[in-house]
């Protein structure tokens, strides 16, 4: 591990090149040209040019960046942003050429934990963002030697106040294909349904998504559980999926759906193989 004195020497030498230096919480803040910055690899949080970004841009124009970002040396030159992607974008939109940052020489796992923890408490985070963020942090903590699946999951959710079980459910969502995960993001598919469907193979999920779009019916938790069971028993196909989705609500027993009705939801070329 590099000593603090060595870190200060390196940061100061960079400051000699670009000027402007101050100290925040004992760490040197340096102004870095924004064209030397690179996004964090597989950054799971979306940076939108929305109304909130407009407000941030106006604040940056008026007051500058009040909280420096955190970066680390990038292998090909420049710096990888660990914390501060929205501030970086705001600087671009505000027409600034530099951004104040703290440069840390940290490994991938440490950088991942910082990246997730500095974003996870935002109010407008999508389920998909949490899913991939929690998965990345979980894997990072495991690499760092965290023992036990349950204990690690609890550590992952500690910053955001999520239980270990909730973290595990979010991580399951990372196994969904993008089309189904989008439905979870827009609240058309509940998280519990998405979690159950995440156990299906990619091909099975594609069949479910096609059926959902054709029937315009979102699976209930009970239907998703039934679909999952069919998958575990190696019995899941298009016919089974349509049959389960078209079951009448609150029926005590299974309902037989006619081949003619099921076939009406398929393109002509696909009907023979399904019915």
Q: Where are the model-predicted features located?
A:
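Charged, alpha-helix-enriched surfaces in structured cytosolic catalytic cores
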Residues: 9, 29, 47-55, 85-86, ...
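Amphipathic alpha-helical extensions and coiled-coil-like segments
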Residues: 132-136, 154, 164-273
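Amphipathic, charge-rich alpha-helical segments that serve as recognition/docking helices
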Residues: 89-175, 199
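Short, charged/polar connector segments at secondary-structure boundaries
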Residues: 1-104, 113-121
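Low-complexity, flexible helical/coil segments
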Residues: 66-73, 103-104, 117-120, 135-142, ...
């Amino acid at each position: 591990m590099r000593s603090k004195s060595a870190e200060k020497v390196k940061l100061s030498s960079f400051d000699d090149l670009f000027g402007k230096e101050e100290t925040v919480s004992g760490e040197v803040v340096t102004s870095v040209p924004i064209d030397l910055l690179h996004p964090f690899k597989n950054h799971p949080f979306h940076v939108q040019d929305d109304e909130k970004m407009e407000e941030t841009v106006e604040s940056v124009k008026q007051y500058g960046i009040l909280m420096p970002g955190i970066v680390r040396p990038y292998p090909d030159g420049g710096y990888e942003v660990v914390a501060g992607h929205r501030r970086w974008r705001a600087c671009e939109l505000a027409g600034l050429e530099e951004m104040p940052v703290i440069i840390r020489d940290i490994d991938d796992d440490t950088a991942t934990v910082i990246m997730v923890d500095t974003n996870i408490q935002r109010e407008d985070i999508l389920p998909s963002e949490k899913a991939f963020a929690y998965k990345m942090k979980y894997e990072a903590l495991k690499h760092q030697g965290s023992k036990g699946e349950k204990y690690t999951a609890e550590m992952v959710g500690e910053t955001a106040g999520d239980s270990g079980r909730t973290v595990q459910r979010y991580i399951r969502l990372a196994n969904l294909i993008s089309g189904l995960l989008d439905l979870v993001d827009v609240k058309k598919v509940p998280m519990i349904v998405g979690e159950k469907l995440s156990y299906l193979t990619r091909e099975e999920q594609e069949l479910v998504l096609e059926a959902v779009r054709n029937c315009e019916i979102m699976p209930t938790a009970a239907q998703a559980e039934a679909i999952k069971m069919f998958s575990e028993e190696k019995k899941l196909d298009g016919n089974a999926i349509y049959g389960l989705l078209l079951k009448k609500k609150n029926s005590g027993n299974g309902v037989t759906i006619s081949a003619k009705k099921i076939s009406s939801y398929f393109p002509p070329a696909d009907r023979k193989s399904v019915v």
